[in-house]
Amino acid sequence: HIAGGVVRNPLVRLTEPVTLDFLAGEHIAIVGPNGAGKSLLVDMLTGKYPLRDGELTYDFSPSLTKTAYDNIKYIAFRDTYGSADANYYYQQRWNAHDQEDAPLVREVLGEVKDDALRRQLFELFSIEPMLDKKIILLSSGELRKFQLTKALLTVPRILIMDNPFIGLDAPTRELLFNLLDRLTRLGELQIVLVLSM
């Protein structure tokens, strides 16, 4: 819930104070042209930009933790490997030296304590065949699946995806659309899509 929200930083304010509610069970799309304030709205909701005026409250129940950090995961999809690993860029996937130093998908995912969740996500996103692949050798579609799996393994209440369809060919977009549809049925997870027009 955000009521009368105005961020402190005067350089990144929206034209009007923000008041809106995301109700339990809702999945939301924030749609608009570039520069319309979509990312700023997300930054307000995640607490990246503290409010000067208004209030921002969360109800993450039934989560055991109450922090936005633990309960909100944000993935910005771009044609780079920035969200997967800040040290790798898309063009580096062709550099043989970088391939030697690049971690495997299994290494970046790390140890997963909840085996049932791991099995569910690995099946949903077909992760098993990727586990021994170097992260910089993943296709755009595989990278999306990896990023979603990595985020969902933390069991967030809210998953925000900024332009998840960017850079994907038509068959991969259709696959991602179907995966997102399946994600909407995962228990307490709320999905927020940020889409540029």
Where are these regions (language model features)?
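Helix N-cap at the start of a conserved alpha-helix in ABC-type nucleotide-binding domains
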Residues: A170-T172
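ABC ATPase nucleotide-binding domain signature region
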Residues: V42-V112
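Hydrophobic anchor residue at the start of the ABC signature
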Residues: L148, L176
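Conserved catalytic loops of ABC-family nucleotide-binding domains
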Residues: L179-V194
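Catalytic Walker B motif of ABC-type/P-loop ATPase nucleotide-binding domains
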Residues: L159-N163
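Conserved ABC ATPase "signature" region
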Residues: K113-M130
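Conserved ABC ATPase signature
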Residues: K134-L138
